[in-house]
C-alpha cells in the first residue's frame, strides 16, 4: 500500500478487500490479527462509529483483518478506517493490543464439563479469538464516497453514547480500546 499523490496517508482504493484467504493469524495462539482505529474529532469530544456489517443495528469502530502484504498494523488500521468509514486522518497514538476473549462461535458450549475435568484452576477456557492492534486517529476529513458507503452508516458519538453502543453490541474489547484513547470522558 503506497502513499497518495500528496504523500499523505495510504492509497485509498475504491473497493474494499474482502475474504480471509490473505489474512494473518498469530502463530502462537491462532488468533486472527486485526487492526483498527479509534477516530476522534480534533477536540477529542466525539468518536466516529460505524454500523456492523453482520449486525446492522450495532455500532462499532472501524477495524479489520491484517493482510499478508501489509507492512505493519498501522497500515491495516488506516486501510480499514478508509474502507469502512471513509475517514481520513493522522495516527496520533498507538493504543496497544487488546485480546478478544469471547469464545469462538464453534467453541464447546459445555465448558463446565471441561472445567470439571481439569484440576488446574488457572487453565484458560480458550485462546483469544482475535488479537486487536488499535490506534488513535485524529479525524481530518470524512468523505461521502468510500468503499463500504452503501453497506454501513457512520456517526459521531460522545464517550457516554459510544460506551453504551459498545456495551449494547457486546464488544468489551472495543470498549477497552476506546477507554485507552484520549476521548474526553463525559460520563464522570
Swiss-Prot record:
Keywords: Cytoplasm, Hydrolase, Magnesium, Metal-binding, Nucleus. A motif (Nudix box) lies at residues 65-86. Binds 3 Zn(2+) ions per subunit. One of its GO terms (biological process) is diadenosine hexaphosphate catabolic process. It comes from the Eukaryota. It is an enzyme of class 3 (hydrolase). P(1),P(5)-bis(5'-adenosyl) pentaphosphate binds at residues 32, 52-53, 63, 100, 152, 171, 173. Residues 30-179 form the Nudix hydrolase domain. Pfam families: NUDIX (PF00293). It catalyses: diphospho-myo-inositol polyphosphate + H2O = myo-inositol polyphosphate + phosphate; P(1),P(6)-bis(5'-adenosyl) hexaphosphate + H2O = adenosine 5'-pentaphosphate + AMP + 2 H(+); P(1),P(5)-bis(5'-adenosyl) pentaphosphate + H2O = adenosine 5'-tetraphosphate + AMP + 2 H(+); [phosphate](n+1) + n H2O = (n+1) phosphate + n H(+). InterPro entries: DDP-like_NUDIX, NUDIX_hydrolase-like_dom_sf, NUDIX_hydrolase_dom. 1D-myo-inositol hexakisphosphate binds at residues 32, 52-53, 63, 102, 129, 152, 171. Mg(2+) 2 binds at residue 80. Residues 1-23 are annotated as: Disordered. Signal peptide: none annotated. SUPFAM superfamilies: Nudix. Its EC number is 3.6.1.52, 3.6.1.60, 3.6.1.10. It is found in: Cytoplasm; Nucleus. GO terms for molecular function: bis(5'-adenosyl)-hexaphosphatase activity; bis(5'-adenosyl)-pentaphosphatase activity; diphosphoinositol-polyphosphate diphosphatase activity; endopolyphosphatase activity; metal ion binding; phosphodiesterase decapping endonuclease activity. Belongs to the Nudix hydrolase family. DIPP subfamily. Present with 3340 molecules/cell in log phase SD medium. This is Diphosphoinositol polyphosphate phosphohydrolase DDP1. The gene is DDP1.
